[in-house]
């Protein structure tokens, strides 16, 4: 959050700021911290010493540009150089050298990294903060059992529990527990020191048995007892140095390393003053924790809420990158040790650069970005998706929770989330509540806590001085925080009015003079996705959640349009997404076309700005920039030069404002189906472009290299018509399903017996050598028809021209809206296109205009998303008045029914200015009498007509529709595979069989269960009779699924004999059965 110079005012932070700050913290602090931990490495004879110097490091500017890295599938990274020294102890000479230790992927202006040509983003993770937490549970007798859980930095746990006899046990796993006296003694304290450092020594003495006195008599005995319990070892182990090392490694390092944050939390919770650099659990911590546990048992102290954000920490980009850098340096340490030993063995003179290789660092980061669950491919469906993806918070991932084990309490909204984590925006399905989104103004503090800004109101003069504070979740517990802002109060009687406030996780109504802090912005509690929903306060939260997710699935349209009713954040989202081209300096436009814009700079310098042209996103949507400035125009810094996909004039534009009616129409909008006019198809209103990538690789086989060629034997010329002389499809070609995109032959060895008779005859008589190559061309799959817009030939480094590594073909498709496509509004109102009506058959208004889309009115009351009605009516008023509205949420705090008053007043004004009384009829405001396009008769009831903002989603029928005539079968069940990608079949399940039985279609049912499914012999006979002709024989034995059941029962030692009853042998002897 940035103050803008005036006290008490602020601007919205950059939406990518969280990512930028994290990466900067890693480069500025994390790198130095990890290099400083790198140990001095000596050889076996301790004659040579190698070390890294932390004072200076250098990151070199990348050798390639971002765009080239994407185009050539390379990593956009910087070379890291550090100073290293090699010291010969005998002569005390030191050789210092700046060495290259590897490449670090850089973050670009979108907050993402480019690895192997793919945009990847690192998600922030929420973990339980290391420290100690006191909780209470009821045992089987209904008695409260108090426990204190110490969580280490790596997620290991050590539990302290107090039983009904006031004995304290330390539980190192679910089964083993030992006395706290034994644990303290194993950590180095004797009985006298233990009793001196606790508040209740008499309680500790009360449960000291003779056996425990013997165990804590010496440190060795205590360590042996602890080792026996911890490792579940039987017999009598003998004390040794290796036993101590094993215990140190397995227990004290894994479960007792608190880290910086853990040490701070334990000091605060237990009122200790141990230095922050002491990051391991000490005996003093254990004893202080035991004292607090005894206090809990006797009613002193407060229990901890594990789901409160003060007990969580954010593992940010900086932490994840720093962990990987530390891992790479640990691998580098092993490499250096091995290299020093090898150099001395072969009597070579080492230098610092010779000892170090760049492989550990480079491979560590490549595997992290490629395999780590928190490193994800950037979703680039539209500009909003890019922004929102980087602001996600996940409970999942290493050290976190899983969707199966997380309980409802963890997933639920907590009062401490307000202003930090959006209570609306989360994923649907198994991960609901586990993947959240940052609130707009939230930021990550130095200690990994989420901070939210508030205005502080001073006691003496609350009007004159206002200061902005950032508070962590533990700090705002002690303040009365007003939920609204001061505009909601009448200036004259401000002090007398009551305001809603939050205090200690409760929501109260208090007098204005008691308020300490107030929120700074109406959208402060919401994420970006939720903040783009107008009239969100009139919607049910579940529908707002769906809307937040569906806006991210909107497809950029060929002709974008700004929303009439918005919230005001559309411009900020578009600018921060990096989709529009923005002027970096002021100047004059010298030249502009679809490829580039040339701008005059300072002096005689010119600045060329390349534009993105028909670039594919990873969701196959089209990224394209259109220039918005003309030649000769003078521009200022920050001005929009070109709009990108789904932006207009620098504002987010995901959908279209279209004329909608809420009414039933012949059942075609039953159950959320949507009826549309053919105008939306022929007018290209919802037309979008999609770009698909098809890729083929060439390999060098044991028989020789694969060849790219146009000369493909045994293929029709029609399929090869689009190939050039090299065997690659030509740019601009129109290709259909089955066409060859790249011709490729793979060499193979053919035995004499494998040749066809005519091939052997040609070889014997004419001496013609028959081709031994197999055709392995790249063919266009089903549904891939379109125009070839780009072909990329990516060769290996140093490779020859006939052996390229990859060939990529990009094909553009133009898709109009059609039956089966999914559309949605911004209030969770979604539906599938059920029918496209001719324009003349659509219902029409009193001025003759036909509506574009018909929604079902029954979808509104039960879903409780009334915001769509407000938006619909206000959109109609805006289109008639040529106005755009930007409305903040919760406007009812200014006065009652504020939203309704605004909408009705705008409709009334539109009715007056356009002289159309039907726009606002006082008897049924917002509704209008409309006419049936087929008959011209008016409908019985007035209907709500308006112009909401409707999006076309990426769930399109072209990607979903699928049919199977033949395909693969599963090996075990012999049934067709599942899924479109595997050319699978449709499963006839239990309920489908009931439906077929209900209509008595016995033959169809038999075919579904035998020929078309898993009867091996019957389906082969079907193929034979189809070719030869004749009737298809009925199957006489059981299908494979029944045989499988029998085999599974036999594996359980249950033998099942079966026989088939048919019409012929129906009168069978029962004794035979």
Curated annotation (Swiss-Prot):
GO biological process: DNA-templated transcription
Keyword Nucleotidyltransferase in record: yes
Keywords assigned by UniProt, alphabetized: Chloroplast, DNA-directed RNA polymerase, Nucleotidyltransferase, Plastid, Transcription, Transferase
This protein's GO CC annotations: chloroplast; DNA-directed RNA polymerase complex; mitochondrion
Molecular-function GO term, any one: ribonucleoside binding
EC category name: transferase
Cell compartment(s), UniProt: Plastid, Chloroplast
Reactions listed under catalytic activity: RNA(n) + a ribonucleoside 5'-triphosphate = RNA(n+1) + diphosphate
Enzyme Commission designation: 2.7.7.6
A Pfam family the protein falls into: RNA_pol_Rpb2_7
Annotated family: Belongs to the RNA polymerase beta chain family.
Function according to Swiss-Prot or TrEMBL: DNA-dependent RNA polymerase catalyzes the transcription of DNA into RNA using the four ribonucleoside triphosphates as substrates.
Subunit structure: In plastids the minimal PEP RNA polymerase catalytic core is composed of four subunits: alpha, beta, beta', and beta''. When a (nuclear-encoded) sigma factor is associated with the core the holoenzyme is formed, which can initiate transcription.
Name this polypeptide is given: DNA-directed RNA polymerase subunit beta
